[in-house]
Amino acid sequence: MHAPHSVALAAGEALTDDERLHRARVFADELTRRRTVRDFADTPVPHAIIEHCLRAAGTAPSGANQQPWRFVAISDRAVKRRIREAAEAEEREFYSHRATDEWLRALQALGTDAEKPFLEIAPWLIAVFYERYGLDSAGNKHKRYYPHESVGIATGLLIASLHRAGLATLTHTPSPMGFLNDILEQPRNQMPYLLLVVGHPAPGCRVPDISRLPLEDYARFV
């Protein structure tokens, strides 16, 4: 097997196990305060904050290091309005015709409907795409390996980074989402993965009274 070109691993901080435990606990405790928000303020968020959070997302591992994620950060009011109008059209179809009764019952606890004002009110939308295949300069297609998994990891890092920066998020997945390619002029080899709504919670914001699974219900040690 051909030996890849390699470089020395950058030295990390020298930590004791107690220090590692403290960091792990603090990080987990901070993420337990993360909540999905649907009621946003229109308070501006500086471009640089979004940029650095996207930098963090871009550090995610990926299949064959192909890094198939593509992000479009949107603050333009007219573009956000177009996205809202297209998303609400799909959502009306979903709630009226596409969703099963079981699915609608599952959504009742969250209080969702076809109206999505947050798509205009929040200062930022981040459209997340994954590359189905790569294209070289000659237009030849190249397979992407594990694009869904890779982009899912990158999106998780993005959400965690935004939370760490003191911002609220909402993962929005209207189906289908092909309108994002049209509005944002993304090439057809890039498929919409989700739409992330980013900003500050509105004053008096309330969230559903739900709970998370305890650790023992979703993890075990062997």
Q: Positions of the model-derived regions?
A:
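Glycine-rich phosphate/pyrophosphate-binding beta-alpha loops
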Residues: G58-N65
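Small-aliphatic-rich amphipathic alpha-helix that forms the alpha element of a beta-alpha
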Residues: R34, R55-A57, I126, R132-I183
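Short alpha-helical scaffolding segments that buttress acidic/His motifs in well-ordered protein cores
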Residues: L31, C53-A57, L196
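Short, electropositive alpha-helical surface patch
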Residues: L180-Y193
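C-terminal helix-cap and adjacent tail motif
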Residues: M1-R23, D113, M191-V222
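Glycine/small-residue-rich phosphate/adenosyl-binding loop
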Residues: A3, Q67, A73-V151
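Glycine-rich, charged/polar anion/phosphate-binding loops
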Residues: A56-G58, A109-A114, L180-D182, C205
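N-terminal accessory segments that position/regulate proteins before the catalytic core
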Residues: M1-V37, A41-H52, H97
